[in-house]
Regions:
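C-terminal domain-boundary segment and adjacent tail
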Residues: 122-196
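Metal-dependent polysaccharide deacetylase catalytic core of the NodB/CE4 family, i.e.
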Residues: 1-98, 103-115, 197
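Bacterial c-di-GMP phosphodiesterase catalytic domain signature
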Residues: 118
Length: 197
C-alpha cells in the first residue's frame, strides 16, 4: 500500500537489498551469487509491491560498496547512490536534533545527498521544517528520475513470490513523509502516505 502511494505521488523508487545485509561482510563478500540474490530480490520485491517497474537506483546497506557488486550493478545498468551527509537520525528522537545534525553538516559541505530514514518519528516530524530551512538557505531538493526503468529478473521474482515476505503494512510512525516531500518537488501526493527506504 505505502509503495503504491509513493508511486502515485510521483516519487522515484529504487531498492536497497532484500534483507538489509552488509554485502561487504561474509557470507556475501565471498559468495557473489548470494550477494546478487540479495540485490535482485530486493529490486523484485519493491517492483512487486509498487505494481510497476522501479528506477534502476540502488543504495548499499551500511554504505559499504563491494567492488564486485559495483561491477555487477554497472553491468545491470543500475546506478548506485551513496550519501554525503548522514543525518544519524536513527540515533535521535527529537526533530530539532535531526534538523541541527543535517543543517550543521550541510553548511560545512555546501551540498550533497542527505541520508535519512523514514521509520523514525523524529525524522518525519523534522521534515517540514528541514525542507523550509533548506529552501530558505538556497538549497534545492532534486527529484532523480531515470531514463528507463529497471527490468527485474524472473528467477528472483520467483524467489520473492515463494518467500511471501511482502508486507501489507501501510503505516509508518509518522504518516506524512511523502506528503511533505511532494510539496517541495511539485508532486501531488495523497493525503496520507509514506516512503520506504
Amino acid at each position: 500500500q505505502i509503495t503504491k502511494q509513493v508511486i502515485e505521488a510521483g516519487m522515484t523508487l529504487g531498492s536497497h537489498t532484500w534483507s538489509h545485509k552488509d554485502l561487504a561482510r561474509k557470507p556475501y563478500a565471498t559468495d557473489l551469487d548470494l550477494a546478487k540474490q540479495e540485490i535482485e530480490m530486493g529490486a523484485s520485491a519493491v517492483h512487486m509491491a509498487a505494481g510497476v517497474p522501479i528506477a534502476p537506483f540502488f543504495r548499499f546497506p551500511s554504505l559499504q560498496h563491494p567492488p564486485a557488486m559495483l561491477i555487477y550493478l554497472g553491468e545491470r545498468n543500475i546506478a548506485t547512490f551513496s550519501t554525503d551527509i548522514d543525518s544519524f537520525d536513527f540515533r535521535m528522537h527529537k526533530p530539532e536534533q535531526v534538523i541541527k545534525s543535517v543543517m550543521t553538516k550541510l553548511e560545512k559541505r555546501g551540498k550533497g545527498i542527505i541520508l535519512m530514514h523514514d521509520f523514525q518519528r523524529g525524522t518525519a516530524e523534522a521534515l517540514p521544517e528541514l525542507l523550509r530551512q533548506l529552501k530558505a538557505g538556497g538549497y534545492k531538493v532534486v527529484h532523480m528520475v531515470p531514463r528507463q526503468m529497471l527490468t527485474t529478473l524472473p528467477q528472483y521474482d520467483d524467489m520473492v513470490m515463494k518467500q511471501d515476505k511482502l508486507s501489507s503494512n501501510n503505516t509508518r510512525p509518522e504518516n506524512n513523509v511523502v506528503h511533505t516531500i511532494g510539496q517541495y518537488i511539485g508532486g501531488a501526493p495523497p493525503a496520507t502516505s509514506d516512503m520506504h527506504e
